[in-house]
Amino acid sequence: MPVNPVVLGTISSAYGISGWLNIISFTQNAASIFEYQPWFIKKLNTWLDVILDEWKYNYHNKLIIKINSIENREAAQLFANCNIIVDASQLPTLSDGDYYWKDLIGCQVETINSYQLGKVIDLIETGSNDVMVVQANQQHSTKINELLIPFIYGQVIKNVDLATHIIKVDWDPEF
């Protein structure tokens, strides 16, 4: 059972009749999900260790896996919509200024003038830079529910303090 669980993907559905499963990887390079072992699945409030027998790309170039002891479609369907989970200790240590999204979600966002903007609830990958989705605090609630703030370190993001869960930004609260 993972001490600090991190979702790296999801099992979407059964594939074929021999117990294979379609998966969706949340890692930047889809096949990188296989570098993190062991996998865990939480099913009916019980943690299960996943023993991966094999993985490959199907003819649609989508990832499929074969889990030990799943031999038919009916057994595979029981795992549909389960998250693929690893322990955070398996993730590589990042260099200064790089952050895992999981660590940013839940942080409070405030301006360099200490104005409370809200809490990070999601991040969006846009290609040029990531964007924080910030649930606006009550001061904004009559006008805006969510703020989209680009995660551009130095220009917009001035400081990330994971110990206090505060992200300081140079951002106009009225924008």
Curated annotation (Swiss-Prot):
Binds ribosomal protein uS19. It comes from Baumannia cicadellinicola subsp. Homalodisca coagulata. The PRC barrel domain binds ribosomal protein uS19. This is Ribosome maturation factor RimM. An accessory protein needed during the final step in the assembly of 30S ribosomal subunit, possibly for assembly of the head region. Essential for efficient processing of 16S rRNA. May be needed both before and after RbfA during the maturation of 16S rRNA. It has affinity for free ribosomal 30S subunits but not for 70S ribosomes. InterPro entries: PRC_barrel-like_sf, PRC_RimM, RimM, RimM_N, RimM_N_sf, Transl_B-barrel_sf. The keyword Chaperone applies. Its main location: cytoplasm. GO terms for biological process: ribosomal small subunit biogenesis; rRNA processing. It is found in: Cytoplasm. The gene is rimM. Keywords: Chaperone, Cytoplasm, Ribosome biogenesis, rRNA processing. GO terms for molecular function: ribosome binding. Residues 96-175 form the PRC barrel domain. Belongs to the RimM family. It holds the Pfam family PRC_RimM. One of its GO terms (cellular component) is cytoplasm.
